[in-house]
Structures are given as structure tokens and as C-alpha cells.
Design a protein with these regions (language model features):
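Hydrophobic pocket/interface hotspot
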Residues: 17-21, 27, 62, 74, ...
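Beta-strand/loop substructures that line and gate deep hydrophobic ligand-binding cavities in soluble
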Residues: 79-138, 147-149
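Glycine-rich portal/gate segments that line the openings of hydrophobic small-molecule binding cavities
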Residues: 25, 29, 38-86, 131
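Residues at beta-strand starts and edge strands
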Residues: 2-4, 56, 70, 89-91, ...
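Short, highly charged C-terminal tails/helix-capping segments
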Residues: 34-39, 138-150
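Short strand-connecting beta-turns/loops that link adjacent beta-strands
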Residues: 13, 67-68, 100-103
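Hydrophobic/aromatic beta-strand elements that line small-molecule binding cavities or substrate pockets
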Residues: 6-8, 59-64, 90-100
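Hydrophobic ligand-binding cavity/cleft-lining segments
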Residues: 1-43
Length: 150
């Protein structure tokens, strides 16, 4: 079973980071990769069963959501090659936040696993997750440096 794992430390308290990313239907914090995020069907961005269509290609379903654990899990039901439903199956992604208590920052981990013999999907999803995490860190870096006076 192929797996990808990516993480980053975001220079902001966990409450601020979670508040920014907790809505399954809001990817405005990731402008370098996500150009559109469409709510598909019924359900809000905080409800298990919510569906989204990213960039007209990635169809995801929210399968677990915890405000307490600051975690969401989703299935990828469709995507572009090399992660299309014809190339991989049983894809589960997880986004999880943890506080870094020594300096009031946030550890963000994003991982996924699926079934497939397709080895191209691993590098593809690593690039996707790295880009998303970089956008998230950059947003808070810009906010902090816009406010700080040194």
C-alpha cells in the first residue's frame, strides 16, 4: 500500500491555523495550487459526508472530522492521472494539527495512503502536499511579518 507523509511547522498558534483550514470547502489559503473549490451536493464544510471538487479534477469526500483533535480525513474519489479512480483506489488522506508548546507554533502533518501498483502517484501526491503546506506556512509568515515591528 503506497503512502505519502509531509509535515511543516507553521509560525502561528494552533487555534489560528485550525481556524483558517478547518472548513473542508475553503482552500483560499492555498492559492498556488488550488484555483477553485466547489461544494458538491449537500452538507457544509464541517460535516462528515461533505464533498468538494478541487480545480475541477479532485473529488473528495470528508469521512472524519474532529474539532477536538484538529483532524480531518477524506477519501479521494476521483483525480487526474496518476491518481484517477482507474489508477488508484481506497485513497484516504488525513490532515492533522498539533501544538508545538515550546514556541506556540503549529505542527501540521498531511498524509495519504491508497491501493495501487502505480508508483507515479507517490511523487505526484508528495508534490501536492508539499505545495499545500508551503502555501499554509507562507500565509501565516506573511501575516506575522506584516504585523511585527522589529
Amino acid at each position: 500500500m503506497p503512502k505519502v507523509y509531509n509535515s511543516i511547522v507553521v509560525d502561528a498558534p494552533i487555534e489560528q491555523v485550525w481556524s483558517r483550514i478547518r472548513n473542508f470547502h475553503d482552500f483560499s489559503w492555498a492559492p498556488s495550487l488550488i484555483k477553485s473549490c466547489e461544494n458538491v451536493g449537500e452538507g457544509g464544510g464541517y460535516s462528515v459526508g461533505a464533498r468538494r471538487l478541487l480545480n475541477g479534477e479532485f473529488l473528495d469526500t470528508l469521512i472524519a472530522y474532529s474539532e477536538i483533535e484538529r483532524r480531518m480525513m477524506y477519501s479521494m474519489d476521483e483525480g487526474p492521472s496518476p491518481v484517477s479512480s482507474g489508477e488508484i483506489y481506497n485513497y484516504v488522506g488525513s490532515l492533522h494539527l498539533l501544538p508545538v508548546t515550546t514556541d506556540d507554533t503549529t505542527f501540521v502533518e498531511w498524509f495519504g495512503s491508497w491501493e495501487s501498483a502505480n508508483t507515479e502517484a507517490v511523487e505526484y501526491m508528495n508534490r501536492v502536499y508539499r505545495s499545500l503546506l508551503a502555501d499554509l506556512a507562507a500565509e501565516f509568515h506573511e501575516r506575522i511579518h506584516a504585523v511585527r515591528v522589529d
